[in-house]
Amino acid sequence: MRVLREALAHAGAVPVIAGIGALRTRDVLALAKDAEDAGAAGLLLAPVSYQPLTEHEVYTLFESACTAVRTPICVYDNPRATRFRFSDELHGRIAALPNIASIKIPRLSGDPVEAAARVGALRAHLPPHVTLGISGDAAAVHGLAAGCDGWYSVTGGLFPEVAQQITRAAGTGDMATAHAQSARLAPLWALYDRFGGIRVMACAAALMGLCAEDCLPRPLLGLHGEERARVAEVLRGLELL
């Protein structure tokens, strides 16, 4: 909560979304209530569990969260991390709950026809007010081109102007510029694939003097030595450092 309060204190008019995922529903609800009381504009919830969850269990989790708070909730569909795969039908049932405002979906195919078909198929199950946000920064431009409403960006947390160049171009229909801006960041995307976005961004923040070198919660470990030097090299090449 200290991190959230610090973020809110410095965010100004920028909305802050708080992650509330936890292994137990009681902890999810406690985090949700604390974040709402602190003033978070939205809540991001992934169905995290040591044991594989059923669709009914995941639905019940989101139902409980929507009952406990009024703050808008974003469904975090991240099968790589959670080992749970949402069906479109389950997304539709959850989206009908009060408070559900958005779904953060996994990266889409680079094939524009396949990507657009995937977005269209999912939208067919959702109320009009529920937005779709793409994740996976390297392929985010494909999601925007396919009709996603936004991009839940790793990069945007530390380099918002860079992410905005892509989203603004996509928002005006200038996909050529959006693709070009994304392609320019290919060295950064390669770092994400190699080390993981959280480690790269933590390293970048440390290089910028925003946090300590070892700022990640254990068991996560930061980048050091040649890895840290490579991140610095890429950021300088992109004029981000």
Task: List where the protein language model places each region.
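Catalytic alpha/beta core domains of metabolic enzymes, predominantly
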Residues: 67, 79-193
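A general structural signal for well-ordered alpha-helical segments in protein cores
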Residues: 1, 28, 119, 140, ...
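Conserved short secondary-structure transition element at the edge of the structured enzyme core
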Residues: 144-148, 184-218
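Glycine-rich tight-turn/loop motif centered on a GG-T
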Residues: 47-56, 171-174, 216-220
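Short helix-capping segments at alpha-helix termini
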Residues: 8-14, 38-39, 69-71, 95-99, ...
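Flexible C-terminal active-site loop/helix
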Residues: 210-241
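Active-site beta->alpha loop and helix N-cap motifs at the rims of alpha/beta catalytic domains
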Residues: 1-85
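Conserved, mostly hydrophobic/aromatic
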Residues: 4, 35, 65, 103, ...
